[in-house]
């Protein structure tokens, strides 16, 4: 354990305990989740209802993945392994921590591949500790069918479930989970700076554009980890036809990942003058690239980058996928969708955006309003706070268990 991790652990243990102690268990503590966790901590402290401690993997410096530290964060590295060839993971030693310190409630990632999701609810219940699952519910990974088979039995193990969107809530209700036991915390990233600090972000975006020699070009931007599920290859396959729509069109692909060098090499072979693959960029430059692009496009495994794109009021095109992350984009209302893998559909969406700027502007204005007023960090925090308060009250018998 590093000195920084020791400080984090000690600080969390010595935090004020006027209220209930609520533990949140995550595979890794990511920097982009800190605004949510900060908000939950502030809600709990505001009336002395609870304090949080967040457990998960940190980086080599003892900081959250992507940077940042908090007094409520405690290091708990995740271990990876396989069962019958299926990737799984677990938190070594967490059961003993639970027995030794006995929190008042536990919030944990709800994923069938996490081994302790099958055992911790039983252990916690034997100790009188309510357990909340925090889950996307739906997955687009190639092994998602395994989760789908296990879901009905899996989610009934938890006292309550926090989900990322309405589609997840509907899926759980169809599986027999009581609607009253589900809390919809619409998944988002911190977009507040887009509405309060847009000039600074946009200025940085223009610097990036100029530095890449793209001033005056129409930018088609894709941000997403470079793995097969993100389907960057679809963009490369469609590129000759996309460029035919507008000779001034350039494609920028931002992020790192296992397929980075492969994608970079293919882009170089297809059109090195018009396709830029940046690799991973410094914190904040993802926002800056989105601020300066003309169209955002996300061909697969849609994630939180679309929230940034919608908040900036950029025309945003996604593959038509199930799931909470993508549900905020409604075709023709807040963005554009095409059938996943359908290159003709992708190209048609890009052409529609370019050919009808007035209609595109109306769609983008609705999306920006949605992100400013509804899909917010504050609303996400509020739902998580509500779920935690229900769990804590189970200790006093105010709310029934399943």
Residue ranges and their predicted role:
Residues 291-302, 314-315:
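Acidic donor-binding loop of glycosyltransferase active sites
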Residues 331-332, 336-343, 352-358:
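Conserved acidic donor-binding segment of nucleotide-sugar-dependent glycosyltransferases
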């Amino acid at each position: 354990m590093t000195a920084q991790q020791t400080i984090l652990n000690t600080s969390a243990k010595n935090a004020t305990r006027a209220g209930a102690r609520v533990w949140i268990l995550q595979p890794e503590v990511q920097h982009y989740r800190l605004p949510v966790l900060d908000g939950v901590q502030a809600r709990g402290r505001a009336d002395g209802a609870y304090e949080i401690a967040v457990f998960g993997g940190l980086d080599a410096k003892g900081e959250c993945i992507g940077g940042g530290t908090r007094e409520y964060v405690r290091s708990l590295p995740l271990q990876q392994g396989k069962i019958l060839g299926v990737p799984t993971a677990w938190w070594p030693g967490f059961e003993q921590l639970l027995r030794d310190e006995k929190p008042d409630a536990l919030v944990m990632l709800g994923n069938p591949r996490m081994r302790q999701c099958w055992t911790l609810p039983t252990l916690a219940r034997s100790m009188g500790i309510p357990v909340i699952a925090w889950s996307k519910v739906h997955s687009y990974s190639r092994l998602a069918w395994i989760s789908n088979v296990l879901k009905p039995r899996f989610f009934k193990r938890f006292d309550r479930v926090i989900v990322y969107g309405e589609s997840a809530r509907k899926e759980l209700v169809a599986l027999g989970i009581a609607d009253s036991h589900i809390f919809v915390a619409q998944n988002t990233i911190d977009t507040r700076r887009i509405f309060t600090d847009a000039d600074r972000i946009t200025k940085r975006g223009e610097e990036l554009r100029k530095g890449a020699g793209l001033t005056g070009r129409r930018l088609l931007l894709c941000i997403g980890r470079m793995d097969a599920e993100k389907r960057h290859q679809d963009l490369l396959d469609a590129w000759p036809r996309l460029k035919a729509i507008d000779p001034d069109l350039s494609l920028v692909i931002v992020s790192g990942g296992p397929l980075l060098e492969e994608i970079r090499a293919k882009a170089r072979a297809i059109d090195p003058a018009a396709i830029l693959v940046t690799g991973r960029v410094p914190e904040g430059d993802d926002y800056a690239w989105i601020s300066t692009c003309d169209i955002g496009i996300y061909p697969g495994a849609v994630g939180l980058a679309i929230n940034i794109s919608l908040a900036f009021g950029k025309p945003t095109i996604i593959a038509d996928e199930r799931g909470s992350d993508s549900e905020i984009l409604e075709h023709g209302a807040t963005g554009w969708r095409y059938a996943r893998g359908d290159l003709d559909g992708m190209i048609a969406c890009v052409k529609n955006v370019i050919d009808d700027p007035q209609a595109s502007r109306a769609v983008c204005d609705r999306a920006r309003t949605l992100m400013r007023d509804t899909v917010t960090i504050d609303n996400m925090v509020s739902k998580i706070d509500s779920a935690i308060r229900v769990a804590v009250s189970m200790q006093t018998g105010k709310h029934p268990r399943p």
